[in-house]
UniProtKB/Swiss-Prot annotation:
The active site is at H299 (proton acceptor). Gene3D superfamilies: Vaccinia Virus protein VP39 (3.40.50.150), Winged helix-like DNA-binding domain superfamily/Winged helix DNA-binding domain (1.10.10.10). SUPFAM superfamilies: S-adenosyl-L-methionine-dependent methyltransferases (SSF53335), Winged helix' DNA-binding domain (SSF46785). This is O-methyltransferase aoiO. The keyword S-adenosyl-L-methionine applies. PANTHER family: O-METHYLTRANSFERASE ASQN-RELATED (PTHR43712:SF5), PUTATIVE (AFU_ORTHOLOGUE AFUA_4G14580)-RELATED (PTHR43712). It comes from Aspergillus oryzae (strain ATCC 42149 / RIB 40) (Yellow koji mold).
Amino acid sequence: MVCVPSSSSVMELANLISQSIPKLQDESPQRANDARGNVIEACSKMLALVTSPAEMLKEMVLINLASLQVINHYQIASVVPLNGHIPISELANKCGLPVDILRRILRQAMTYGAFSEPEPDCIAQTDVSREIPRLSPLLTYQLDVCLPSMVRLLDWLKDVDGEHACAYQIAHDTKDTWWSYASKRPELIENYGKYMALITSGGAHDVSYVLKGFAWEKLGNAVVVDVGGADGFVGISLAKEYPNLAVIVEDNLGLKDSADDNIPQHLKSRVVFLPHSFFKPQSALSRDADVFLLRHILHDWNDNDCRAILQALAASMKPGASILVAEQILQRPGAASWQRERVMRALDMQMMIQFGSKERAYEDWDALFKSVDPPLEIVDCVQPVGSADSFMELKRRA
């Protein structure tokens, strides 16, 4: 049965789009970004209104992901010239794929805008396909690591109290957490670091919001520990912006070479990488820190593991020191924009599937912090305009 949308609802959305489009060129980046968000949300809602429920469900299949996974794995977008075109037989030979198989995969990908066929059996780039090499770390993580986990969610739910902590462990036939599993596979850790740097460059998770979410300038000469800081991209940004800060980046030993390469020569006196597990007490070097930054760390862990991480920090903090937790705060259904809620709920599902963890509401965060021994309390919470993350400053309760 086809659902007929209300013409007034469709017109309201069309009017919103018409009103927002001129603002896309606004001199204010924030106003332009808000207008862009309005257009995306209105278009998404309009599509949902005019698409029948059956059509909507059919669109949610994994076929698009299958072709995209092949394109990313074989680096096809890096072989197709940026301008002009390439015969599909030559492309297939360079990628090591049968011509007929490649033709079918690419023609399916063309239905969602990736590549074009300007002449029979000749492949050319589109704006979409040109982005694939840049986004490869994200695609590799989502399609090669997360996708197999997603399709095992049902198996995990059938034995949710069993030996596996999440669907990821079933998919990859391991009892290890993702982090333990990846630590034995340097290519996974390296790609994950690139993935994190990619998703925090632009958009609602941009690293610039770290600079706005806390009064760093008021610290004066201070030491900041970027706990679980990957290859140092956040710590480097802090040190560049605030010359009085010294930054210690802590993470897996496998990231040390990448971090050392990333740190500019002129910052090496103020930014250092220190191999460290955040489940263990801080080293003598880090115990003198004024701020311990936990950015996108705790949502990867269940409550018990979060308590262990926070407890190790709380026990190491000098008097007056702070923990700064940068995380998404889940809002009640309908409180955020439609598009923002989609992203929040998708991330929450990913945490469940990949880590056996979750995104948390403010009340969840508050209860978690208070359950640490010694208890931690939120003394400030800032969400910069445009940021998906809130910055919660914690102190040991007096």
